[in-house]
Amino acid sequence: RLEKKDSSLFHTLAQAMSSIVYAAEKKEIAVSVDCPENLIISHDSKWTSEALFNLLDNAVKYTPSGGKISVSVVQWEMYVEVKVTDTGKGISESNQAAIFRRFYREEEVHEQQGVGIGLYLAREIVTRQGGYIKVISEPGKGSEFSIMLPTK
């Protein structure tokens, strides 16, 4: 059950980041974060952190050694956008809707561990808080996932 309350998005993001730092370092992936420390929004910190972790974990998994992952937070009028951008393998346009289905995995990624529920779960968590997730991606160019959370 989700419990939204006013809390620091910086803290929520830091929680998610702490779970991927080691894996990113091991692959020599440069990770940058740009998030205002004083940004307070109404969200379920525990579950939002889980959703962010799922995006970050995928970014680490599918970004080759020496790649880059950047996380930025932008406050719009109605939403706060948490954007996770990577220099990974990318996702073809024809697969971009399917990646949010439960147990969906692309053909080419079976060497990676996973059961295909990370993005499904992330979308459920965000949707139940009145937000949405969008993706922009191109094979060979990486991916950009944005979690949009309502400011109210």
Predicted regions mapped to residue ranges:
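A conserved beta-strand-to-alpha-helix junction within the catalytic ATP-binding
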Residues: E3-S18, S32, V74
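Conserved catalytic submotifs in the C-terminal HATPase_c
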Residues: E3-S7, E25, A30-I40
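Short helix-loop "hinge" at the ATP-lid/N-box region of the Bergerat-fold HATPase_c
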Residues: A59-V60
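Short beta-strand/loop element within the Bergerat-fold HATPase_c
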Residues: G66-M78
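Short conserved segment of the HATPase_c
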Residues: I91-F103
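Short alpha-helical Gxxx[C/S/T] motif in the catalytic ATP-binding
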Residues: G118, A122
